[in-house]
UniProtKB/Swiss-Prot annotation:
Spans through the membrane: none
Region (Pyrophosphorylase): 1-229
Pfam families named among the record's database cross-references: Hexapep, NTP_transferase
Chief localisation class: cytoplasm
Linker, as annotated region: 230-250
GO biological process, one term: cell wall organization
Source organism of the structure: Lactobacillus johnsonii (strain CNCM I-12250 / La1 / NCC 533)
An example molecular function term from Gene Ontology annotations: magnesium ion binding
Region (N-acetyltransferase): 251-461
Name of the molecule in the record: Bifunctional protein GlmU
Gene3D superfamilies with a match to the protein in the record: Hexapeptide repeat proteins, Spore Coat Polysaccharide Biosynthesis Protein SpsA, Chain A
Amino acid sequence: MNKYVVILAAGKGTRMKSKLYKVLHKVCGKTMVEHVVEAAKGTNPDKIITVVGNGAESVKDVLAGQSEFAFQEKQLGTGDAVLAANDLLENLEGSTLVATGDTPLFTAETFNNLFKKHEESGNSATVLTAKAPNPFGYGRIIRDEDGNVLRIVEQKDGTPEELAVDEINTGVFCFDNKELFKALKQVGNDNAQGEYYLTDVLEIMRKAGHKVGAYEMPDFSESLGVNDRIALAQATKIMQRRINEEHMRNGVSFIDPDTAYIDSDVKIGNDTVIEGNVVIKGKTEIGSNCYITNSSRIIDSKIGNNVTITSSTLQEAQMDDNTDIGPNSHLRPKAVIRKGAHIGNFVEIKKAEIGENTKVGHLTYVGDATLGKDINIGCGTIFSNYDGVKKFHTNVGDHSFIGAGATIIAPVNIADHAFVAADSTITKDVEKYDMAIARGRQTNKPDYWHKLPLAKDKEWE
């Protein structure tokens, strides 16, 4: 049986009070509509069609290559939105699942189960339902004695008996495709909002003698629709719990999973430990047996095995195996830390490669530089790379030693086995085995203390 998915993503979402269109708000690193498309892909459909309206070009940019698109010119209800896909689907055999782009928590498993139930039951329409702990505000599912759906009763229209039902409409449906578009052409807009409702299709099909059923999914939380910032935070919390639990099932330890924020595309190896208040975002990959301490923030970075990150920030950076950093250090874009290197506290590295077993201990800035292996960079060293107009590069060879407080003014090359004395300002190349000293000579002034202002009118021994 052919399968199609229609995702409704034309609404602006005024309750979000945002310039960003509702379905483009992110949950754990992906837009809401991307989460829905990802779940849809898990059903191996023949077509995914996203109905766009407000912010159409922005939504198309996000979903480029993942979906076909239909355009809803005016937002005249869910029935009108599905009808916008008429030209792409009308005459096709198969089943069509309809979902909304603001429900990011639905899983591929749930969508697959809905397709399966729909096809096995021989329904023309199947409603995805759930048991709600508090069904207030939801449409209630009213079934007949055989379990078929008679109608969906909205909160404002229900009798006390109907409102006592806790099975609710999640807003996701599966239809016989041809019957869907035949029924949509019969939907009217004789209601207070003047809109065309997709739910009216159920009554049209039932009256035509078609079977309308339901599939009750076990996890009500999947059905959460996001209409405001409160619901966005709730969806993020639920998604985050899922992500962290999946990592834990795969061998990752979380000291406090409730406070660790991990984006959905992050990969983490087994035996890695994540402390609380850690943020890991984007396409970050972390190897096995790593330790990430509290208050670390890692974005779009690649981390090898046996790496320790202590309360530090990494952005578009790379740390190879057996390296460590922190506390309170910062790897900026294109920072590469090679195997065995040590980055200490209060170090900033930008667009620089730190070679194997090199140590950059503390209070240092390394920018636009290539450092070889087995180098020691002393405390307070500055790689001065910018003249106010251009950035310049520095090279430091293997087995070199840079003393504390040195300033390396690029462009300059320091050869293998070179030595830079502490507090030197280096402006010229340093050759192999040479030591560079560039600082003023010390001069001692005998008995000068008594000439200083602080010594006047005071008794000093």
